[in-house]
Structure formats: structure tokens, C-alpha cells
UniProtKB/Swiss-Prot annotation:
It catalyses: L-glutamyl-tRNA(Gln) + L-glutamine + ATP + H2O = L-glutaminyl-tRNA(Gln) + L-glutamate + ADP + phosphate + H(+); L-aspartyl-tRNA(Asn) + L-glutamine + ATP + H2O = L-asparaginyl-tRNA(Asn) + L-glutamate + ADP + phosphate + 2 H(+). Disulfide bonds: none annotated. It comes from the Bacteria. PANTHER family: GLUTAMYL-TRNA GLN AMIDOTRANSFERASE SUBUNIT B MITOCHONDRIAL AND PROKARYOTIC PET112-RELATED (PTHR11659), GLUTAMYL-TRNA(GLN) AMIDOTRANSFERASE SUBUNIT B, MITOCHONDRIAL (PTHR11659:SF0). Heterotrimer of A, B and C subunits. This is Aspartyl/glutamyl-tRNA(Asn/Gln) amidotransferase subunit B.
Amino acid sequence: MSDVYADWESVIGLEVHVELNTKSKLFSCARNRFGDEPNTNISPVCTGMPGSLPVLNKEAVRKAILFGCAVQGEVALLSRFDRKSYFYPDSPRNFQITQFEHPIVRGGRVKAIVQGEERYFELAQAHIEDDAGMLKHFGEFAGVDYNRAGVPLIEIVSKPCMFCADDAVAYATALVSLLDYIGISDCNMEEGSVRFDVNVSVRPRGSDELRNKVEIKNMNSFAFMAQALEAERCRQIEAYLENPNKDPKTVIPGATYRWDPEKKKTVLMRLKERAEDYKYFIEPDLPVLQLTEAYINEIRDTLPELPYDKYQRYLHDYALAEDIAAILISDKHIAHFFELAAAECKNYRALSNWVTVEFAGRCKTQGKNLAFSGILPSSVAQLVNFIDKGVITGKIAKDLADMMMESPEKSPEAILNEHPEMLPMTDESALVAIISEVLAANAQSVIDYKNGKTKALGFLVGQIMKRTQGKAPPNRVNELLLAELDK
């Protein structure tokens, strides 16, 4: 069956809803803040009261323009708003204000690394719209919280330019990182700040046809996205294989599904609506949104260094491995931490390992982010410098790192001043004595080494380091051990 599956490929496009981190909502002065008591951040506009009129939030427009500039899209000098009509309890007006025909951004692309290769994922458009409220279920009844109603969104629509789950996850990851870098959203997927609607169809490999697509709604996890895409891919392929003589348009009807993580399958929600079902028409209460080139350029000039550009710089300036550079730039706060530390430590590879592996592992067990742990970048730089200068051994450095996690305000130097017993052995006569004891206790290993078995040397070094509790300088141990063995 897997060989049959290999003859098919997925065609995937994503619609990403991004909540903008403005202080107020898109068309009213109601507060835009997650987690408050239900129905406390509301106004006549976002609850659809008769006679209330929308007023466009300038900051939301600025953030949408900033996104357009970041993806090198075409920011429209003229765009407008439309009403998308539908009835649902969380939409008190019975319509959404969106941009159907004239979006604020057209085109653009997102750069990503997929399995070590550089990829560009093309965008169709990005438009501004307001969010709906939220239904909360309580046993046999449900309540509606309108705190989210009217929260500003940009919906980012990709072209169907992804052909497997890995592509989709790489694009989504790169997009969220980009949004975080430019600071237009808090990108908290658990709180729904970024939600993915995934459109997927399948076709015989080598074909260029676009068959009926299925939409999987409201994905808020990269892992669930990958699982859902693979499950839906298999479902559609099996349907086509079971109905080889049917018109493909009738085999997979356009529909909306959700992902059930417990059953590991997509579940039908409803058949797909057509655009005309929403009865789009121009929003009569909002004027055309008119921008100037000067205003767009002013916003473009505020763009920070973007993730992919930072990734390339890390490869070039710091000579880091691709996987390490990718880990560092995936979190802008960690990247900033690393750069501050790199200003004081030139062993960039060792430093990156301490940031992404040693301290990252310790922080993960405590549910922390190194950038917010209280540990200073200069302290991590000092730790690596101490290793390079022979002030401490690698074993001592790890013990120091543990103590830094407990007392983040203290530098390695301060900890060593308080605990001089942690410093490495400097008494060579004592070290030579330990080496002699180890050689006497491991005569067979000495014979093996002299017979050309180099692994025996590593064993002897390990025994010496064990006796010294990791405090002996490894380079000096090797020198003295070889001198003793050559006698």
C-alpha cells in the first residue's frame, strides 16, 4: 500500500489567521486582551448594537503593512472592506468585516529551510478582518464570550505551493517566526493568536491538475498539522483508489473537516460553502482605505533583521552549523541572548552549544527560557572563556551551569570565589601520584596500550578523571599520562 501511496502527492495551501497585538479592537475602542473575564472587553460595535459604527484602528493597518513589507508583497495604495454574511451565535452582527476583493497585501513569499534546502513559499494575499466571539460549552448549554469579537486579524493566504506535510510545517514555522520577529502578534498558538486552516487535495504524482480540496479548520499545533495532513492524504488516496472509474470531482466533495487527535482522523464538519453563499458586498460604513508610498516606506524602514537573513548571517559571521543556526534564530530572544554573549566570547561554536544544548536542556526541565532565566549573556560567555583558558574543566563547567540555574544573578567567577574547592587541580605532583595509582591498578590496560590498542588510553584517562572528580585539566592529564607510559 505504501508503494501505491508513493504514486500520489498532496497539494497544500494554508490560510493563517493572526491576531494583531493592538491595544484596542479593529473597529472600536474596546480593549484587546486575552484572558479577562467573559464579556468585559466589549463595546456596541463588537456586539452588533443597532446604530453603532466602526472606526478603523490605524495601528492594525500599520501592522498589516509591516507584514506586507516583510514578505516583499505589494501593499495596495487603495484597499476596501466588505461584509461577509453568515449566521452563527458568536457573530452578533451576522456578518464579518473583511477584505474580499481588494486586500491590503497581494503576493509576497516566506523563506524557509526544508530538510536542509532553501525554499520560497508564495503567498496569494493578506487581508485585514475582525475576529468572531467564542462559544464556551458547559454540559447541556453554551455561553458566548464576545471579548474576542472584533479583535483585529490579518488572514494570510498562501498559494497551493506545498506538496507534503513537511513543507506545510516548515512554512508555518517560518511564518510564525517572521510574525514574532516583526512584533505584530504575540504568536501564542495555545491562546489562539495564530490559527491555521489547511487546504489539501491529492493528485497522481507528475500531474498538474488541482482536484477538489478539503479544509481542515483551526489547527493550533505543528504536530497536529502534520498528523492531520498525513491522515487526510491517506483518506483521499484510498477514496480515489476505491473509485477508479468515477469522476474525481464526485469522489472527494469540497468540505470542511476538523482534526480529532484522539481518533487520529479528520472528522467532517460541513460541506464547503461557495463564495456566493456569503453574499459579499462593500462595507457601507467604512471608506476606502487610501495609503501613500511615503507612509508605506516609512513603515518599511522600521523592519528589523528577519529570521532568514539572521540565519544566513550566523552561517557567515559565526561559522555555525546549519542546524545550530536554525535553532538559535527560531526564537528572537534566544538569538539576541546569543549575540550579546558572542560579543564577549569568540569561540562561537562552543558558545552556541552551551546556549542551545547545555543551558537549553536545563531550562526546559524547569519550564524556563534562557533569555528570561535571569542568567546574563556575559555569564555564559565567561563560562566558555574559562574552559578555553583552562581555568576550569568541562566537568566543572557543567557543575557551574547547574549552580547558575539556581543562582542566575551570579557569574561563574563569583561562584568560584565562593567555592574555591571547585577549581581544577593545580598540584601536578598529586596528579602524577594519582596517575601512578591508576596505572598500577590497571596493568592490563597498560599492556594493551603498549600493544597498540589506543582505546586503552581513553580508558585510563577516564579512570584518572574519575579519581579527580573531573577537576584535572584533560590536556595536562594526557601529557602526564603519556609521559608515564613512555617510561
